[in-house]
Design a protein with these regions (language model features):
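Conserved alpha/beta-hydrolase catalytic His-Asp/Glu region
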Residues: 56, 71-126
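Conserved serine/cysteine hydrolase catalytic core
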Residues: 104-161, 165-168
Length: 169
């Protein structure tokens, strides 16, 4: 994915750029900065650290979304109600439901959930190798209530991104 972005930006005439990514996009942005350090002017990573996360954490959510019988559901409100038992956190459900789209009168998921479930081990892995490093300006932004970027991750972040600043919202 990082190489695809680099090729696309190069074709569009962007030879020096800043990149910002959230979650999986943050992993791609980190990989891009390490692979193409001369092209990346600044790196901003939101709510993810350069580490492996437990893939099992996401499987119940993906299963709940895949088990939803969208052919019998007519609105996001109905989908929200149907997911309440398996995904009790209201705010998280609302976030997930932003990926639900009405196409020709039928609700469909924007992401390919089957591919996400099959690829979850790969997607949860640390995108960087032990020798990777980006020495340019880097900002890691974390949510105050999020568990994805914890204080104990700071040393690991600094290993890969020695100029990194970490901010909490």
């Amino acid at each position: 994915m990082a190489e695809d972005i680099s090729l696309c930006l190069d074709r569009l005439g962007f030879h020096k750029f800043s990149i910002c990514g959230h979650s999986l996009g943050g992993k791609v942005a980190m990989r891009l900065a390490c692979d193409f350090p001369k092209a990346v002017d600044q790196l901003i990573v939101v709510d993810i650290a350069p580490r492996t996360y437990p893939a099992e954490h996401h499987l119940p959510t993906l299963t709940a979304l895949l088990d939803l019988e969208l052919s019998k559901i007519e609105s996001r409100k109905e989908a929200d109600h149907a997911l309440t038992e398996k995904i009790p956190n209201w705010a998280f459900r609302q976030f997930l439901l932003t990926n639900l789209e009405m196409k020709n009168g039928v609700l469909t998921w924007l992401p390919n959930l089957q591919i996400l479930r099959r690829s979850i081990q790969f997607l949860s892995a640390n995108p960087l190798q032990s020798t990777d490093q980006f020495s340019g300006p880097s900002l890691f932004i974390r949510g105050g209530k999020s568990g994805y970027v914890r204080n104990e991750h700071f040393q690991e972040i600094k290993k890969y991104f020695p100029e990194a600043q970490i901010e909490t919202l």
